[in-house]
Amino acid sequence: MQRNGLIGDTIRSLGFLSRLPLPQGWFDNTDDSLPRNARAFPLAGGILGLLAGVALLIANAISLPPLAAALIAIGALAAMTGALHEDGLGDTADGFFGASTPDRRLDIMKDSRIGTFAALTLVIWTGVKASLLMAIIARAGAGYALLALIGTEAASRAGMLAFWHALPSARPGGLADSMGQPQWETVVCGCGLGLALLAIGFLPSGGMVALINALVLMTVVLFGFARLCMAKIGGQTGDTLGAAQQIGSLAALIGLVMAL
């Protein structure tokens, strides 16, 4: 089997983006460059969304209320990823709004302690995402909420990939900078995969309106976030990549709920 093909890239992307147990053989003697494997980030995100959706379906099947089912799905995503992207969102909120200079913002973002801005952002973000999933369950059904999670988690990682490519590193010599950036061909492939999975996730319940809503909202908010990153720290870091994924996922869900 081609370990450097799309399947191998997907497994290695899961290895980076999640804590799922994966066969070690897929990581041996391969071109494991993260910027190259990143074309499969949307596929890895779709798998994570599927697993979180299954948790939501189980919660719904045993008659738990929609809020509980939504929170279980969100918790499952955080558990599978080690809250990788949520950590980035929180650190970004602390850094961007807790300091007045780029260097100080970057220092705060490296600090593992959680601050007021991070706590507030994560609480509000979790509440909004849970309410959106509840709305999908109520208006379309739990099965469509599962599909929405697949599409959202895939498309948001495609958006993260484009964001990573578009912005320079804000911290030369840092971890994100040392990994390099994905090439244009990688971004095009990843965005194509993300769009396909977003269509699979959103068209059955919300039709073309939901798909267009999601694409427009994701584009607008990620462009705005990119401008904010340039103004605050002069580029991107690993934390802002995680924040971009979280922001993109929320924008996509809002687009779907608007169409239901």
UniProtKB/Swiss-Prot annotation:
KW Transmembrane (keyword) present: yes
Locations listed in the record: Cell inner membrane
Cofactor(s) required for function per UniProt: Mg(2+)
Superkingdom of the organism of origin: Bacteria
High-level lineage: Bacteria, Pseudomonadati, Pseudomonadota, Alphaproteobacteria, Hyphomicrobiales
GO CC annotations, alphabetized: plasma membrane
Name of the molecule in the record: Adenosylcobinamide-GDP ribazoletransferase
Catalytic activity: alpha-ribazole + adenosylcob(III)inamide-GDP = adenosylcob(III)alamin + GMP + H(+); alpha-ribazole 5'-phosphate + adenosylcob(III)inamide-GDP = adenosylcob(III)alamin 5'-phosphate + GMP + H(+)
TM region(s), chain numbering: 42-62, 64-84, 117-137, 144-164, 192-212, 214-234, 240-260
EC number per UniProt: 2.7.8.26
Organism of origin: Brucella canis (strain ATCC 23365 / NCTC 10854 / RM-666)
UniProt keywords, alphabetically: Cell inner membrane, Cell membrane, Cobalamin biosynthesis, Magnesium, Membrane, Transferase, Transmembrane, Transmembrane helix
UniProt record similarity statement: Belongs to the CobS family.
Protein's gene: cobS
